[in-house]
């Protein structure tokens, strides 16, 4: 992607995030995060107590209470800053997209045809169903479908890809996106959306929306954090009468400090930032997610449906071998195959011409001088070829050639059937060549499996993800390629109905399914899949059915999408583990400091040997605030992701974030206590 990648702490974003952090101090903003709302209330309460102590209305150490109050406000500000910084990065990405939107005029046609009378209207007044004409140099004013014409289109403003693409009426390349530019020729387009509903508008809203909906896992975690907060709130509330009964009541300031240090403020302050950053990281790979729910679902996926062509294989099948029929010389087959392919501009056709040239020095003949009639490939005939000097040469699929021969009163040779099976078992696609009603032999078209793909599938398998290859090839060819690529299963001779049925079958087993698609025929399956990545080069129907759009139109990106989803879930889980483990050290810091005067036996818990009760409590509160700042980079970038089994991943995270969550606070609180003591601040 050519877009500028934002630095983690871009100065302009940091300044803006600090301003937003202050704005978020209002109660309406704080209420959305129950854990931090408790801290906000505690900050307000201790501020009032500090003022009362300073004015003499209440007894107590006003300076200590003010210090606690100040650091509680800092804790809230740091949590606000983390969320604002994540949102700011997304808004910066949205602003780069807004730059694509250009106020322009459109030529609205009165009739749906080229050459019809046109009215010049503002582009933002176009409605769904309006017909517009765009010519070379024009900006396409709306999302739509090409109903007439063909043109080269520069989509770099949307995709970041500088190479132009062809958009034309009919087929899967008729969809155009508003904001892109026509480089040559012309298009007549039917607008498919109303103002404010374009793909670009939706992209901006998705990456900019501060009022994003929480995902199911995020809601579940929030409920857990609220439950823990309530438990600690009740526990802290009972400590005041407990200490008062002992003859030395603990101050409200100390109790508030204890509560704030015990509740999971670390994950509470970073939870929103993690969710926003997940969508932002997805956008960084040029994938637009319609919601955080889609990103989260990607992390839970356990079945991947992968198209063979372009995802598992390179996609350009190359002629690798000429296999003559019984009684036919290989050179005769190669000559006929080359003649039939002279006008075939597909990669397969060109590779046949080149292979014949390499094997038998059969030079490519001048098409014009042959005075031949070329027969183009059609979906109905599934054959192509040439008529030359009373010779009728055809090449095509086995079934198509068989029907062609039988229609001309011939018989398909049994030995060629065997050769076809042999080619298919090797993972190649058989193409049969016939002259008249005589079968000359088979061309093997080899689809090359991408390097390293087998290892990636092995990693996915280790993570518990099943890979299924989807292909239109016959079962023998599909089985051979599946074995070579290392996928777990395959669906051969796939149809849209078969894809949809397969997705429903896996979902009935309780699995979450991810897939990619680009055509209108993929729309039902995309709508059914839990994670559906539509290609930006695909049809409008496919993009509307999916819950993600890949701007690069790269089917392989599906594996990366799953990795990002899993990384977001791992980040959330790891920081939750770290946050809860933190409480142990804070317990050893504050409990002895708060209650040792009443119960001297609790001094045994002061294993850190902190200087004084005041320094112990203040050190814990300061650490509680600072740890949020130190973890912001981790929340935004995500934890280091490695493809491991669920049990191995759990063990790794417990060691790193569980044990780390235990040890880091002990070290941090002790260091802060020493600094406070050396500086004479307590």
From Swiss-Prot:
It comes from Escherichia fergusonii (strain ATCC 35469 / DSM 13698 / CCUG 18766 / IAM 14443 / JCM 21226 / LMG 7866 / NBRC 102419 / NCTC 12128 / CDC 0568-73). CDD domains: P-type_ATPase_K (cd02078). The keyword Transmembrane helix applies. The chain crosses the membrane at residues 34-54, 62-82, 219-239, 254-274, 588-608, 616-636, 656-676. GO terms for molecular function: ATP binding; ATP hydrolysis activity; magnesium ion binding; P-type potassium transmembrane transporter activity. It is a multi-pass membrane protein. PROSITE patterns: ATPASE_E1_E2 (PS00154). Belongs to the cation transport ATPase (P-type) (TC 3.A.3) family. Type IA subfamily. Keywords: ATP-binding, Cell inner membrane, Cell membrane, Ion transport, Magnesium, Membrane, Metal-binding, Nucleotide-binding, Phosphoprotein, Potassium, Potassium transport, Translocase, Transmembrane, Transmembrane helix, Transport. This is Potassium-transporting ATPase ATP-binding subunit. The system is composed of three essential subunits: KdpA, KdpB and KdpC. It holds the Pfam family E1-E2_ATPase. Its EC number is 7.2.2.6. It is found in: Cell inner membrane. It comes from the Bacteria. The keyword Nucleotide-binding applies.
């Amino acid at each position: 992607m050519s877009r500028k990648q934002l630095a983690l702490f871009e100065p302009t974003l940091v300044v803006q995030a600090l301003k937003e952090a202050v704005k978020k101090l209002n109660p309406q903003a704080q209420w959305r995060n129950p854990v931090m709302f408790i801290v906000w209330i505690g900050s307000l309460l201790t501020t009032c107590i500090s003022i009362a102590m300073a004015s003499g209305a209440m007894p107590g150490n006003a300076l200590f209470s003010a210090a606690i109050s100040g650091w509680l406000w800092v804790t809230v500000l740091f949590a606000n800053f983390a969320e604002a910084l994540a949102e700011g990065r997304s808004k910066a990405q949205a602003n780069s997209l807004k730059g694509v939107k250009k106020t322009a005029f459109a030529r609205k046609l009165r009739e749906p045809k080229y050459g019809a009378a046109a009215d010049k209207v503002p582009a933002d007044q176009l409605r769904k169903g309006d017909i517009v004409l765009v010519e070379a140099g024009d900006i396409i004013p709306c999302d739509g479908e090409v109903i007439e014409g063909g043109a080269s289109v520069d989509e770099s403003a949307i995709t970041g890809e500088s190479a132009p693409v062809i958009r034309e009426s009919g087929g899967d390349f008729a969809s155009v996106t508003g904001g892109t530019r026509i480089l040559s020729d012309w298009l007549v387009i039917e607008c498919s959306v109303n103002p404010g509903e374009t793909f670009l508008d939706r992209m901006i809203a998705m990456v900019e929306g501060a009022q994003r909906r929480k995902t199911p896992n995020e809601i579940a975690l929030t409920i857990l954090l609220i439950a823990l907060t309530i438990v600690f709130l009740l526990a802290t509330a009972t400590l005041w009468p407990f200490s008062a009964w002992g003859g030395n009541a603990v101050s409200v300031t100390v109790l508030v400090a204890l509560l704030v240090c015990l509740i999971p403020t670390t994950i509470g302050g970073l939870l929103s930032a993690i969710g926003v950053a997940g969508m932002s990281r997805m956008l960084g790979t040029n994938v637009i997610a319609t919601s955080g729910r889609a990103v989260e679902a990607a992390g839970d996926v356990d079945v991947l449906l992968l198209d063979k062509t372009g995802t598992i294989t390179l996609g350009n099948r190359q002629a690798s071998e000429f296999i003559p029929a019984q009684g036919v010389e290989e050179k005769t087959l190669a000559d006929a195959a080359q003649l039939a392919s002279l006008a075939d501009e597909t990669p397969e056709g060109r590779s046949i011409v080149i292979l014949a040239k390499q094997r038998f020095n059969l030079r490519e003949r001048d098409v014009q001088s042959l005075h031949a009639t070329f027969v183009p490939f059609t979906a109905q005939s599934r054959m192509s070829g040439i008529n030359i000097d009373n010779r009728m040469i055809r090449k095509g699929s086995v079934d198509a050639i068989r029907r062609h021969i039988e229609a001309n009163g011939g018989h398909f040779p049994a030995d060629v059937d065997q050769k076809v099976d042999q080619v298919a078992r090797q993972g190649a696609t058989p193409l049969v060549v016939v002259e008249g009603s005589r079968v000359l032999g088979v061309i093997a078209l080899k689809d090359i499996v991408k390097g390293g793909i087998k290892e990636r599938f092995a990693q996915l398998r280790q993570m518990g993800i099943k890979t299924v290859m989807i292909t239109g090839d016959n079962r023998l060819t599909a089985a051979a390629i599946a074995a070579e690529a290392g996928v777990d299963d395959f669906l051969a001779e796939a149809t849209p109905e078969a894809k949809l049925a397969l997705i429903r079958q896996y979902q009935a087993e309780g699995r979450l399914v991810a897939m990619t698609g680009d055509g209108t025929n993929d729309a039902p399956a995309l709508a059914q899949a839990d994670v559906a990545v539509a290609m930006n080069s695909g049809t409008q129907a496919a993009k509307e059915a999916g819950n993600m759009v890949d701007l690069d139109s790269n089917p392989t990106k599906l594996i990366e999408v799953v990795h990002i989803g899993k990384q977001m879930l791992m980040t959330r889980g790891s920081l939750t583990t770290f946050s809860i483990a933190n409480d142990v050290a804070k317990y050893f810091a504050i409990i002895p400091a708060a209650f040792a005067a009443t119960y001297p036996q609790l001094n045994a818990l002061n294993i850190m040997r902190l200087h004084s009760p005041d320094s112990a409590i203040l050190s814990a509160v300061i650490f509680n605030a600072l740890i949020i700042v130190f973890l912001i980079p981790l929340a935004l970038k995500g934890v280091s992701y490695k493809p491991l089994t669920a049990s191995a991943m759990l063990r790794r995270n417990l060691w790193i974030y569980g044990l780390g969550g235990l040890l880091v606070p002990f070290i941090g609180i002790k260091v802060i206590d020493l600094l406070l003591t050396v500086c004479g601040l307590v």
